[in-house]
A protein has these predicted regions:
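Catalytic-core signature of thiol
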Residues: 1-266
Length: 266
């Protein structure tokens, strides 16, 4: 079956950069890690009918972070719709494609950065605010792996090829398939890596990108367009955060960007 997407083109406004506050002496991270492996029962959360992939990524990230660091909390379908409606205020999940429901003009997807700004300023439907968020240089795999090792999760924005739908259905890693057209923009949760692949969750299943996809470019557009770390309250005080993040640099960059002081207390 064809699945839905829903990531709008990135707006690329100023944002924190993870590489600037990554500690100069980065703690050694394992050659491979799969933070997703301990969890099963991932849910579709509406992305088979509506373009809510970005809201689903929020729910999946909150589940992974809480399950790893505290007590698991998987946001509900109702909460996913609530977050989706922050950028689609007229959307009604019970509506139809000819009115205001899935597939209608009120089902317009989300911009990743705008969603992260909302989570930082207001908090998600689960009542938790993001402490901060930052862009990761997805072209630097060492930085990508360091981000995953420190935070256990990446919010990714990608372009999906038509061929990737078939690879997903067959349980194969996603690759850059020559000649396959771009099918849509998608937001997903990255949650692990090997020497060659990045692991992720989409459409309720764990799969992975082959290196050819990660480095792929189609018609001048990178297949991986966005990668973000989100600092949640659960990260504060953890050994990985304390050793991997230059907190003084993070605070300075945050103040330079926003004009406000960053609070890093639990």
């Amino acid at each position: 079956m064809p699945y839905k997407y829903g990531r709008r083109p990135p707006k690329n406004t100023p944002a924190l950069r993870f590489g600037r506050f990554l500690a100069r002496t980065v703690p050694a991270y394992p050659p491979q890690e799969d933070y997703l492996a301990n969890l099963s029962g991932w849910q579709m959360l509406g992305n088979d009918v509506a373009g809510d992939c970005n809201a689903v990524t929020w729910a999946n990230m909150r589940r992974l972070v809480t399950a790893t660091l505290t007590t698991e909390n998987y946001p509900t379908q109702a909460q996913v719709w609530q977050f989706y409606q922050t950028q689609n205020p007229g959307f009604d999940p019970n509506g139809t494609s000819s009115t205001d429901g899935p597939g209608s003009g009120d089902d317009q997807g989300m911009d990743v950065q705008t969603g992260l700004e909302y989570l930082h300023a207001t908090g998600g439907p689960d009542g938790v605010k993001a402490v901060a968020f930052a862009k990761v240089d997805h072209t630097n795999l060492d930085e990508v792996k360091a981000a995953l090792a420190i935070f256990g999760a990446l919010w990714l924005g990608i372009q999906v090829l038509d061929a990737n739908q078939h690879e997903f259905a067959e349980g194969r890693p996603w690759t850059d398939v020559a000649g396959s057209p771009i099918d849509g923009g998608h937001a997903i949760l990255g949650g692990g890596y090997t020497a060659a692949d990045i692991k992720f969750i989409t459409w309720a299943k764990e799969t992975e990108f082959a290196r050819s996809f990660w480095n792929g470019v189609v018609q001048g557009t990178p297949l991986v367009e966005e990668a973000w770390v989100v600092i949640w309250p659960e990260h504060l005080g953890t050994r990985a955060f304390e050793q991997g993040v230059d907190q003084a640099q993070l605070a300075a960059d945050y103040q330079a960007l926003t004009g406000n002081q960053l609070v890093l207390s639990q």
